[in-house]
């Protein structure tokens, strides 16, 4: 790890949850942005159009 000295400044009990939490928030924001600005993504989540028999 080339940034191993960061843990001498930031306690791992604070830094690791903060890092994982920020990654989670960014992922949720990206999904919401795609969901609200495209038409194909909501259709993809719905599984496509079903054909009537």
Swiss-Prot record:
Gene Ontology biological process: photosynthesis, light reaction
Chain ranges on the Cytoplasmic side, renumbered to this chain: 1-13
Gene Ontology CC terms: organelle inner membrane; plasma membrane; plasma membrane light-harvesting complex
Transmembrane segments annotated in the record for this chain: 14-34
Membrane topology: Single-pass type II membrane protein
Gene Ontology MF terms: bacteriochlorophyll binding; electron transporter, transferring electrons within the cyclic electron transport pathway of photosynthesis activity; metal ion binding
Keyword annotations from UniProtKB, A to Z: Antenna complex, Bacteriochlorophyll, Cell inner membrane, Cell membrane, Chlorophyll, Chromophore, Light-harvesting polypeptide, Magnesium, Membrane, Metal-binding, Transmembrane, Transmembrane helix
Localisation: Cell inner membrane
Binding site for a bacteriochlorophyll: 31
Protein's job: Antenna complexes are light-harvesting systems, which transfer the excitation energy to the reaction centers.
Subunit (UniProt): The core complex is formed by 9 alpha and 9 beta chains that bind bacteriochlorophyll and carotenoid molecules, and is disposed around the reaction center. The non-pigmented gamma chains may constitute additional components.
Listed name of the protein: Light-harvesting protein B-800/850 alpha chain
Species, as recorded: Rhodoblastus acidophilus
